[in-house]
Amino acid sequence: MIARALCAAALAATLLLPVVVVHAGEETGVARVSQGYAGSASCRECHEKFYQLWSTSFHGLAMQPYTAALAKERLTPQQTDLAIGKLKYRADLSKGVVTEAGPNGTKAYKIEHALGGKNVYYFLTPFPKGRLQTLPIAYDVKAKQWFDTAASGIRHFPGTDGSRPVSWRDPEYTFNTGCYSCHVSQLTMHYDLTTDTYKTQWAEPGINCETCHGPSAEHNRAMRAAAKGTVPRDLRIIRTKDFTAEQHNASCAVCHAKMAPLTPTFTPGDRFFDHFDLVTLEDPDFYPDGRDLGENYTYTAWRMSPCVKAGELHCVQCHTSSGRYRFREEKDANNACLPCHKARVENAAAHTRHKAGSPGSKCIACHMPMTSFARMNRSDHSMLPPTPATTIAYKSPNACNLCHTDKDAAWADQTVRAWHPRDYQAPVLARAALIDAARKRDWSRLPAMLDYLASKERDEVFATSLIRMMPASGDPRIAPAL
């Protein structure tokens, strides 16, 4: 979603005119899919425990039909209209519609699907030509508030002002071309260029078992044909237990990366970069130091993590296959880091300089601080230590001030420098300065950029970012680096 400007909320009088109900009749939705896929229900016969864990998870419920039961369990009625420009919007949960009232009357848009649910529910309505469009109001699960979908997506890039949101009718908010691939399973877009229509279809809403394990029909047949008490040598299914760390990470990154697809099909176990082009710091949705500003998901920061670079860490060590965090209990908070950082975990107070058992003594408080964008929480998966010096330079967030909100970045910078005489912030500041210069087309720093690319200590994300931006310099010295 691309921010274009800041919304001016002007109230308009609601006219008591007849309600027009907006429909779209094209064939977009659930369809039977063959090609060896049998559906998640077929897994339940032998894997009831995992089926229950999956079906109640945010993976299994990544998208679901809007129902009265969902509304009763997860949503609270909207008490006041939301004004967006000259229009007013309200969700009528009992009727399953969002009404739009304005100078030309009132329209009602059917709520057909609910998207998400961990932090936010977005809602989809049928639009002409087979499109599913994100409705203009969404629901904050934790705050129990309704809010303006598009206004929440404004980036507020440093040094800019006057931003305004994209209209909710914009193609940026069309499900068929945006968020479809990670909220339903076995999807085909079925776009007809000549008629500009979609017949987008999927096997199941949510992320199903076969998304990670591949088609299961052959597996089901093999298991049913096996003699009682025996297991076939060839299970005819993808066994993620046999994956390397890189294969695990690649399989998760398909949905947890900001990227551009290069091929139409990814099979779990494939190499990520054979199928996708990862967005790096050429995108202003990142601060120059690599911290998140806008919507970036996880994988770019993950590739910057020293823990990941060591080669053994993968997503399923901290998260279950259904997406749950394994260390949510307070007593287990630091166990995620225990296998590799035993000495520090066992004496966390000395390492963190925070009282044992306090929020600041958790590893993730400093190394994976949580920020939010568009009301969606995300933890920093770079796992880098706090760098308040980059906050001073580039306004990026730092873990110290996310907790110590009564202090400023200068205080945090002085504190970490007093605690750590070795200036670990210097390399981060140096490479962030190169990204900042490249973004500003300040090619006086080109020699330093080339030196960084030649360094054995370079970070692949920062190096890739520079390589992508340097051609704008037009300088022939960049040729060897490219």
What are these regions (language model features)?
Residues 1-5:
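Positively charged n-region of N-terminal signal peptides that target proteins for export
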Residues 7-18:
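Bacterial N-terminal signal peptides
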Residues 19-27:
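Signal peptide processing junction and immediate N-terminal pro/mature segment
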Residues 30-34, 41, 49-116, 120-128, ...:
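Primarily the internal scaffold of c-type cytochrome electron-transfer domains
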Residues 178-183:
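Long, basic N-terminal domains or extensions that often function
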Residues 461-464, 480:
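Alpha-solenoid HEAT/ARM repeat scaffold
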